[in-house]
Amino acid sequence: MKTIASATLALLLLARPETANAQNRTAVDAGRDLYQYSCAICHGRGPGNPGTVALQAKYGGKSPALLEDRTDLTAATVRVFVRRGVSIMPFFRKTEVSDADLDAIAAYLTRPRASSSAPAAPPR
């Protein structure tokens, strides 16, 4: 009986929103590190990154070329592009980017952002 009560308590704690938010923050933090290691070489800030340059040409300023600035990406979209590749971007096998790592990268790229409709702080 004590085991059942302990298991139930553990499930309730794991189901709490605070726990889910902490787990998501951990995935986002891991995803940021993985993105910097695996993706930023092509999709990072600065001149000469082929992924960013290609997206600048494709979108012509209508959508951010820097993936980290996009707010319209879904986890499914990130997974499709990484697994299938597109244009000059190669596909990545599960031996190159594991499913768990890809989930973390997707969590980072689709993380909630502060609302851009919030008023700017007044100048000092």
Spans of features found by a protein language model:
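The canonical Cys-X-X-Cys-His
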Residues: G31, Y35-G46, I105, L109
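Conserved beta-strand positions that form and line the central face of beta-propeller blades
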Residues: A65-L66, I88-F91
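C-terminal capping alpha-helices of c-type cytochrome domains
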Residues: V82, R93-R124
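Bacterial N-terminal signal peptides that target proteins for export
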Residues: M1-A7, P90
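Bacterial N-terminal signal peptides
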Residues: S6-A15
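Electrostatic cytochrome c docking/interface patches
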Residues: L14-L34, N49-P50
